[in-house]
Amino acid sequence: MEQLLHYVWKHKLFPLSPLHTTDHRQVEVIDPGLHNRNTGPDFFNAKIKIDGMLWVGNIEIHDKASDWYLHGHEKDERYDNVVLHVCGIIDLEARNSKGEPLTQMQLSIPENVLRHYQELLSIDQYPPCYQIIPALTRLSVHSWMSALQTERLSQKTEAIAERVKKCNGDWEYAYFVTLARNYGFGINGEAFEQWALSIPLHSVDHHRDDLFQIEAIFLGQAGLLELSTIPERYQKDALNDGYFSKLRNEYLYLQHKFSLAPIDYKLWRFLRLRPQNFPHIRISQLANLYFRRQASLSHLLEATTVKEVIGVLKTSVTPYWETHYTFGSESIRNEKHISPFSLNLLIINTVIPILFAYGRHRGEEKYCDRAFEFLEELKAENNHIVRMWQQCGLEVENAGDSQALIQLKKEYCDKKECLRCRIGYEYLKRK
């Protein structure tokens, strides 16, 4: 409950009068102070009046007064300028490192705030706060959605910055790895990232003009050219499959040449995966993209509109995969172009974060601005999270909105971070 006490104090969600210290002096809260999330007192530079006298200093908040000693504050000089010790329960007198007694005040959590908080924590299908969404002003919703959108983009930027470190500062390589990860479309994202990191692009570049060799390296590094990785019912046909044999022999030669180590085939997940999303198909599409030099960051940076980006990312499989989903099993011919739906997701999860991260890194605002422009122009995602919020009454007009709502669900609702949510705040302060 200490976290909730912090919240009640920060937002002054308590009756402003009468408030009294344990020795019956009247307290008036003018400014609750600046919330400190690091070590030290909980609130800095608060302004309070005690019996009419103004005090400026720090506030410490605990469930029980005895927590002061439990946390060792009586030995810590940083807590000597605490002007008020606010507690849910006062069970003893507390003193600072100088031996001076603290001014203490009991603060109860208002019944309505406690009730609403418990409702928020008992989330089932919908967060209970959805009831107040229709009553929120358009401005407050727009402001919160904008903040969530930026927060989500910043999180993705941090992930890309870490990827750039793994790639020794090579942004082209980091872009390829990010693109590959998102070709996994969630289920195989981690496997695709490990696969991309296993490919030494500087070496592969020597064979960039040969699509067959690129596909051999790409499929070989995925562990997909081993006979044991092919379903048993197709293995006999795969042995008689000339393309499989040629790819395998070419990979063995290139593996030796570049000392390549493939990833573990078991990383790939096939259960409940549509054949269109099989790693073989996605890797062939990436090989084609790489061969046409469309998988390069420099090429992407030249694209100034969504239409141009789509032109950069459009790809299909090599001829063999038009009639196959796996080795040794022929299927009806299908060119297997990457779908508009998948392109939309790739731009949202790859292109936009890369533009934003690269723009920040280089201090070039035009790329950051372009990222936000693309978010406003692209269609919203259509998934269970977005549909849930739409049913709750929130309007979803573009990809920026859907990204904001995914951030809200994953980082606030799922983690029970209602006290950091602006909708949660409106819900808690209701009577």
Predicted regions span which residues?
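N-terminal "leader" segments that precede or initiate the main folded domain
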Residues: 1-7
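Catalytic micro-motifs at enzyme active sites that drive phosphoryl/nucleotidyl and oxygen chemistry
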Residues: 32-37, 45-50, 67-75, 90-96, ...
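Short loop/turn segments at secondary-structure transitions that flank enzyme active sites
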Residues: 65-67, 90-92, 111-113, 185, ...
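Compact, glycine/acidic-enriched structural inserts
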Residues: 80-82, 86-144
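Hydrophobic, aromatic-lined core segments that form the binding pocket/scaffold
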Residues: 149-404, 417
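Cysteine-cluster motifs in flexible loop/terminal segments that predominantly coordinate metals
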Residues: 403-431
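Aromatic- and glycine-enriched beta-alpha-beta binding-site module
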Residues: 55-93
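N-terminal ordered "arm"
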Residues: 7-66, 79
